[in-house]
Amino acid sequence: MSRKQLALFEPTLVVQALKEAVKKLNPQAQWRNPVMFIVWIGSLLTTCISIAMASGAMPGNALFSAAISGWLWITVLFANFAEALAEGRSKAQANSLKGVKKTAFARKLREPKYGAAADKVPADQLRKGDIVLVEAGDIIPCDGEVIEGGASVDESAITGESAPVIRESGGDFASVTGGTRILSDWLVIECSVNPGETFLDRMIAMVEGAQRRKTPNEIALTILLIALTIVFLLATATLWPFSAWGGNAVSVTVLVALLVCLIPTTIGGLLSAIGVAGMSRMLGANVIATSGRAVEAAGDVDVLLLDKTGTITLGNRQASEFIPAQGVDEKTLADAAQLASLADETPEGRSIVILAKQRFNLRERDVQSLHATFVPFTAQSRMSGINIDNRMIRKGSVDAIRRHVEANGGHFPTDVDQKVDQVARQGATPLVVVEGSRVLGVIALKDIVKGGIKERFAQLRKMGIKTVMITGDNRLTAAAIAAEAGVDDFLAEATPEAKLALIRQYQAEGRLVAMTGDGTNDAPALAQADVAVAMNSGTQAAKEAGNMVDLDSNPTKLIEVVHIGKQMLMTRGSLTTFSIANDVAKYFAIIPAAFAATYPQLNALNIMCLHSPDSAILSAVIFNALIIVFLIPLALKGVSYKPLTASAMLRRNLWIYGLGGLLVPFIGIKVIDLLLTVCGLV
């Protein structure tokens, strides 16, 4: 659920944007946009000419020249207004985040445990590694990891989602964000950042976008626009000697008007606004992008790597069955599985403990009282377990346990292989339990594929995007779930190294890869991916490696991220097509008007039957300014997007924005010409 959306033309934002538009008239600000800088120079030049004409220092129609000059300044102001309005919307979103930051005190613990003595210190003095206690009603003072306890947390100030979430030590839900509120119970938190480096601080800095850099495609388009501007500038400059040689030299004011109408001012004036609005729309989806480059890359993505758990399935795998090996009692298997899971804080581990209680009334035992050593799960070993007395119990993936058994001189039973295959073919995940070198049996973990996910993958396939499911399950389980979900491919028994290798393989083929992640083990792959969406509930390492953060911690959001990225690219392309098509119509308005006196044959091009040369030129300049304002909503909201193939989208946009770009100026210029004539202004 997103926070409240701003109205497109919020009155306070419009007023502020108008002020900023005037401030941006300074040369330093204009220089950043070469196309509009040419318009700015033309405005300055025609203003000087108008003043000279009015004072009698130059011959000519001072009123006409002043009208042209005024509308050129308005053109620059409208372009500035579009950019300022987009920036203002982003800053307003940043200000809403700043409201989350509150001056508060924290209870800094002297020892890293609940009940230890605490000192009351200002929250902004907490450093990385400090341990704090937060209880019901408290604001979490820093970003960190829960090391003890569990609590219900209200994260609506950050995510906009009203439903509270559970944060607890261990597992995937241990990360907390400063500025959120504890609703119940208590947490002991280890701060993971220093002051000024919190997630909220980085969010605000990213959203404000003060250092927004142009993306590669934006730079390429700017170079194209500069090239077109130079071509039209040279062409316009050569027209004066031609007209002078014909005996009726065209005025500098008319030449400036011609140049401004021919260069791509529409897209030139809206280009920055489109980029800023793309990042703003991403925030509207509760995704923070670190740069416009990340948003743009999302639009070019053609491979999606999707974690099975939480993205394709509901992500709440639960132990559903104990399947003992031949010669092993089911209760013996359940007892060993529970012992191996006593210190396992993952949902799967806890479900194993609960299932053993339910089936055989095996009460949970304390690891410390048993004088046992817990062996945590790692991405490399893909096992966890416990060492107690002379017993060494492990649970983990089939391959990991097989290697463990063989390394200890044992043999992996064929009947267990059959049981593993049976569980996997049912779409469940098999975990194998072993004591020493003796395999005790299999635990079945069951998950459910999300409703409607198959249809979404079909849409992505239609857009030319390949979907790849990433899972730690064995190949049989992965194949069953992949077939049910409708993904194009899958990577089974995935390790961090395998994910990284797969991304590099696709990139070597010239593809752009997007993925999501939330764990420290995802960080290398997130850093390598072109679009890397880290979950807000994930670890600090994952957030730092990604170039986007999903505040809702919803892995399925990756599909929406791609949608927004493609919409931004389509908006830029559509308005570029519209802008260039505009020039053709303006050519038919100004060229006959400017040169008909010198070359009467050009009257044949006056297909719009405009009233007079002056009205034709002024109408084209007015239209050139007004079209920027009319297109601001489209630049900010983005063009309508549908999941189509690239060729189908190109045809659609050429018809709508190419043909529209030709017809709209003909109609608009003719209407303005009629109004000027009826009102006696020309």
From Swiss-Prot:
List of residues binding ATP: 344, 348, 377-384, 395
Sites of Phosphoserine modification: 162
Active site: 307
Gene3D superfamilies listed in its UniProt record: Calcium-transporting ATPase, cytoplasmic domain N, Calcium-transporting ATPase, cytoplasmic transduction domain A, HAD superfamily/HAD-like
InterPro entries: ATPase_P-typ_cyto_dom_N, ATPase_P-typ_P_site, ATPase_P-typ_TM_dom_sf, ATPase_P-typ_transduc_dom_A_sf, HAD-like_sf, HAD_sf, P-type_ATPase_bsu_IA, P_typ_ATPase
Positions bound to Mg(2+): 518, 522
Segments on the Periplasmic face: 56-61, 243-251, 596-612, 679-682
Locations listed in the record: Cell inner membrane
Transmembrane segments: 34-55, 62-80, 223-242, 252-263, 575-595, 613-631, 654-678
Catalytic reaction(s) noted: K(+)(out) + ATP + H2O = K(+)(in) + ADP + phosphate + H(+)
GO cellular component: plasma membrane; potassium ion-transporting ATPase complex; potassium:proton antiporter complex
Coiled-coil intervals, chain numbering: none
Impact noted for substituting residue 377 to Y: Slight decrease in ATPase activity
Recorded domain comment: A protein-embedded tunnel connects the potassium ion in KdpA to a water molecule at the canonical cation site in the transmembrane domain of KdpB. The structures suggest a translocation pathway for potassium via two inter-subunit half-channels along KdpA and KdpB, integrating KdpB directly in the transport process. The periplasmic potassium ion probably enters the selectivity filter of KdpA, travels through the water-filled tunnel to reach KdpB, and is released to the cytoplasm by KdpB. KdpB undergoes conformational changes, whereas KdpA, KdpC and KdpF remain static.
Function: Part of the high-affinity ATP-driven potassium transport (or Kdp) system, which catalyzes the hydrolysis of ATP coupled with the electrogenic transport of potassium into the cytoplasm. This subunit is responsible for energy coupling to the transport system and for the release of the potassium ions to the cytoplasm.
Assembly description: The system is composed of three essential subunits: KdpA, KdpB and KdpC. The complex also contains KdpF, a small non-essential subunit. The KdpFABC complex exists as a dimer above concentrations of 30-50 nM, whereas the complex exists as a functional monomer at lower concentrations.
Family: Belongs to the cation transport ATPase (P-type) (TC 3.A.3) family. Type IA subfamily.
Official protein name in the record: Potassium-transporting ATPase ATP-binding subunit
Organism: Escherichia coli (strain K12)
